[in-house]
Amino acid sequence: MLLRLPPRLVLRLDAICDASLALFLFASSWDALFEFLGLPVPKPALYAQLLGAALVGLAIVEWLVAGRPGQREVARGVAVGSALAATLIVVWLLSGRLPTDGHGDLILWFVAAFLALEAALHARNGWRVA
């Protein structure tokens, strides 16, 4: 059974996570960081940085809409996006085509699990019967 967290809190926590991931993606031109973590180095870094910019925008929307009208619709969209992202990470990990080491694999499995949990929490809040 999923935790019973208020929808407002789920959106605010997710906004903080999105902003944190955005900061990491902004550093995608720093190859040594990705190599240290055993993660694939984004080439070109521009795409990862663009994703970081999009995540900043999403974090702002999540923070501002928390506890307000439109919260359920945002939660639904975030649930779908998080589920898709988790699925993509798992597919890539299972394909064995990612240039990662043991540390990188562990990090990506954790991220996939976190995204799946996030998707479930947002889905429960987004499709809850009033």
Give the residues covered by each predicted segment.
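Membrane-water interface at the C-terminal end of transmembrane alpha helices
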Residues: 113-130
